[in-house]
Every structure is written in structure tokens, then in C-alpha cells.
From Swiss-Prot:
Note: According to some authors, RBMXL1 is a RBMX retrogene on chromosome X which is likely to be functional.
Name of the featured protein: RNA binding motif protein, X-linked-like-1
Cross-link (Glycyl lysine isopeptide (Lys-Gly) (interchain with G-Cter in SUMO2)): K80
Biased composition range(s): Low complexity: 158-169, 323-339, 354-371
Post-translational modification Phosphoserine, affected residues: S88, S161
InterPro entries reported for this sequence: Nucleotide-bd_a/b_plait_sf, RBD_domain_sf, RBM, RBM1CTR, RRM_dom, RRM_dom_euk
Record's subcellular location: Nucleus
Biological role stated in the UniProt entry: RNA-binding protein which may be involved in pre-mRNA splicing.
Species per Swiss-Prot/TrEMBL record: Homo sapiens (Human)
Record's compositionally biased regions (Gly residues): 107-120
GO cellular component: spliceosomal complex
Database matches in Pfam families: RBM1CTR, RRM_1
């Protein structure tokens, strides 16, 4: 592709290597005023490469000089004089530099692509950071089937700001297990367990579907129950036991329980804020103990559909509901005995249940009875919660 250089610029080729700028200026200066004489030299040897460019102030003078001097001899060599085009070397220097430059931007784009790869890199690096968040998110929310869809925001926030999303992914994805971010309110006060909790949840997920069924059952059974006054009264000691000794199982069950409590929007957040961790931790632990037997005594593990779940609990509410007088004594006996029977049926030695500190037994009797019967019925009315469950 031959482009004409600027008007008034002449290309002089076939020069003797001895010809210099002064000789050119002398020869061509008689046609008009010369603006520039450019003798092309070898970079290394600094010798003339045999051609030059002479730029006249007036394009008309350049045309005259080209017409007269083309083919004439200069310093013993016939020279070629014509309107300068952007020669290949100069295209190489100016033209191709745009290609290099234009290739540069593609390289920049490649860098842009690589850059997006780069930006993809940091998020993926963040992703690795987040892999903690994501894998937790996966594990925890995978223990509750549909939630990963709802947990979409943590991954999205994970993309742009991995560092932020890793913690929020932690809290939110661990709350993702429960299904709602609001529990991060309740849960932030327990900064420890959410981080420890992914492992149990992973254990839940992969241990057996039945166990997971039970843990969801726990979450619902204990969902209704942490609101009983008994659990709040007894909260502090069991919190010490469950948080320290049974942290995994209790925290595992606690978070589903509080997750579902929060998810159902029954104001459980307030219940939890009333007795922040003790009740629900202990309760979830109790429900964990019970869940292994209670589902057996109640029937099949809950289906994951909402209606049967609520039917189950509404029936359990009706079945075990009533005044605190009735459930506090008889129901506690019933459930503690059911617990032992269920453990024996499942092949768990009864001693497992008795092996925990004695305070747990005393609390388990009251809370095991109290939550079951009292959750919606006794304790809610007792707490003056005139709100209808539904």
C-alpha cells in the first residue's frame, strides 16, 4: 500500500553513499526553499543507505525539482527523484508501529483478555479465598437443597470483592444453610461456631440422608421450642456444655434451627435475642438427641415439602400442646423415655445419652418436654406472644 507523503516532500534514491545532506541541499536548493533534508543512514555504521528525503516549502517547487532531477547524475550515480511516498521502512517505522501499536492494543486486549483473565484470576484467587466461602456455601447450603439458588448473592458479591465475600460468604453462606441472612444477626454473636459449622454440615450432608432428614427435623422441632421460658432460664449452664463439649453437633443443629426459625418469620429473632445462644444451643442439642428418636416415634423422616412439615408440627403442636403443667412433667418423661427408646432402636447405647453431664439430663428433661409441647402452644402463650403462628 503506497501512500503519498506530505506534499513538497521528495524521495531521492540511488545516491552515492558519499553524498551528504549538504550536497543534497546545494543541488536541490536552487528549485526553492528547502525545509528539511533527511539523509537516511545506517544505524550501526552511520553511513548513507543511498536515499534521502528533501522537503520543499512549496509543493510546486518540489514538483519542479522532481521533474528536473529525476534520472540525473549526482556524485557519479543516477538518482531517482519523485514525490515521496511513505516507504516500506517508514511504514515499518510509522505504519507498522501503528500495527505494532494496533497490535499493541490487541496485545493490550490480550492483556485485557489476559487482564480479564487477570481479573478473572484475582476473583478466582479470591475464589480460592472464597472457596472457603464457596465450599462452605456449597456444603452448608447443599445440606438444604434449594438454598444455593437463594445464596446466589454471596457468589456474586464473591466475584467482585472476594475478600469481602469470603467473610460475608462465611456468615451468609453459613446462614445460607439456614436459608436467610437475618440470622447472621443472631449468628454473628457466635462468631466461632459458624466457622466450625461447615464441617458438621458437610458431615450432615454426606453422612446419610436420614441423618440430614433428622437434622432438618431438628431444625423444625427446635425451631418452635427455643422460645420456652424453661430453656431461657436454664440457658447459661447448657450453653457452657454444648458450646464447648458438643459444639459441633449443637452448632450444627442450632443453625438449621435458628435458620428455619428466622426463615419462617415467626419473630424467632426476638426469641433468640431474648436468650441468645444458650437456649437454642442447648435446645438444638436436645433436639439433636431427640431427633434421632423423635422422628422414629413420630413417623417417617419429614419430607422436604413445606406442607407436610407444617402439618407434622401442627399435629405435634396439637398432640403435645397444652398447658405448661401438662408438658413440663409428663411430656418430659415421655420424651426422655422416647429418647432412650429411640436410641436403643437405632442401636445407640442408652449410655450415650446418660454419658453427658448430669446438668444436661436435668435440662434435657425439662427442655425436651418443654420445647415439644410448649413451642407454639404453652410457652408462646405463656410468654404473652399473642401472635398467631400463622
Amino acid at each position: 500500500m503506497v501512500e503519498a507523503d506530505r506534499p513538497g516532500k521528495l524521495f531521492i534514491g540511488g545516491l552515492n553513499t558519499e553524498t551528504n545532506e549538504k550536497a543534497l541541499e546545494t543541488v536541490f536548493g536552487k528549485y526553492g526553499r528547502i525545509v528539511e533534508v533527511l539523509l537516511i543512514k545506517d544505524r550501526e555504521t552511520n553511513k548513507s543507505r543511498g536515499f534521502a528525503f528533501v522537503t520543499f516549502e512549496s509543493p510546486a517547487d518540489a514538483k519542479d525539482a522532481a521533474r528536473d532531477m529525476n534520472g540525473k547524475s549526482l556524485d557519479g550515480k543516477a538518482i531517482k527523484v519523485e514525490q515521496a511516498t511513505k516507504p516500506s521502512f517508514e511504514r515499518g517505522r510509522h505504519g507498522p508501529p501503528p500495527p505494532p501499536r494496533s497490535r499493541g492494543p490487541p496485545r493490550g486486549f490480550g492483556a485485557g483478555r489476559g487482564g480479564s483473565g487477570g481479573t478473572r484470576g484475582p476473583p478466582s484467587r479470591g475464589g480460592h479465598m472464597d472457596d472457603g466461602g464457596y465450599s462452605m456455601n456449597f456444603n452448608m447450603s447443599s445440606s438444604r437443597g434449594p438454598l444455593p439458588v437463594k445464596r446466589g448473592p454471596p457468589p456474586r458479591s464473591g466475584g467482585p470483592s472476594p475478600k469481602r465475600s469470603a467473610p460475608s460468604g462465611l456468615v451468609r453462606s453459613s446462614s445460607g444453610m439456614g436459608g436467610r441472612a437475618p440470622l447472621s444477626r443472631g449468628r454473628d454473636s457466635y462468631g466461632g461456631p459458624p466457622r466450625r459449622e461447615p464441617l458438621p454440615s458437610r458431615r450432615d450432608v454426606y453422612l446419610s440422608p436420614r441423618d440430614d432428614g433428622y437434622s432438618t427435623k431438628d431444625s423444625y422441632s427446635s425451631r418452635d421450642y427455643p422460645s420456652s421460658r424453661d430453656t431461657r432460664d436454664y440457658a447459661p449452664p447448657p450453653r457452657d456444655y454444648t458450646y464447648r463439649d458438643y459444639g459441633h453437633s449443637s452448632s450444627r443443629d442450632d443453625y438449621p434451627s435458628r435458620g428455619y426459625g428466622d426463615r419462617d418469620g415467626y419473630g424467632r429473632d426476638r426469641d433468640y435475642s431474648d436468650h441468645p445462644s444458650g437456649g437454642s444451643y442447648r435446645d438444638s442439642y436436645e433436639s439433636y438427641g431427640n431427633s434421632r428418636s423423635a422422628p422414629l416415634t413420630r413417623g417417617p423422616p419429614p419430607s422436604y415439602g413445606g406442607s407436610s412439615r407444617y402439618d407434622d408440627y401442627s399435629s405435634s403442636r396439637d398432640g403435645y400442646g397444652g398447658s405448661r403443667d401438662s408438658y413440663s412433667s409428663s411430656r418430659s418423661d415421655l420424651y426422655s423415655s422416647c429418647d432412650r427408646v429411640g436410641r436403643q432402636e437405632r442401636g445407640l447405647p442408652p449410655s450415650v445419652e446418660r454419658g453427658y453431664p448430669s446438668s444436661r439430663d436435668s435440662y434435657s428433661s425439662s427442655s425436651r418436654g418443654a420445647p415439644r409441647g410448649a413451642g407454639p402452644g404453652g410457652s408462646r402463650s405463656d410468654r404473652g406472644g399473642g401472635r398467631s403462628r400463622y
